[in-house]
Amino acid sequence: MVTAPGQLESHYAPNKALRLNATEAGSAEWLIGFGEVTGNVTLSASGDLVEAAAKLFDLLHAADANDRPKIAIAPIPRDGIGEAINDRLRRAAHR
């Protein structure tokens, strides 16, 4: 039984293909960076997972709205809140 939106198998998902754990942008990809992986935008240049969680959906929407046909996102550590971030990303990539 689903009692909250976060329990759905597919949560917010961009309209574009989303590649996880990218360390660089591929052809025609908009890269969302994290930590040492720089991108067109970044969830957190310092690797702060709380900052990354706060910016996640805004940056996914921005990536979906840009002119590149694909989205890539840097690896996010699975420590603490990073586990929840990775869960949301997995759901967003599941289309």
Summary of predicted features, one role per range:
Residues V2-R95:
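A C-terminal functional module that forms or caps the active site or interfaces directly
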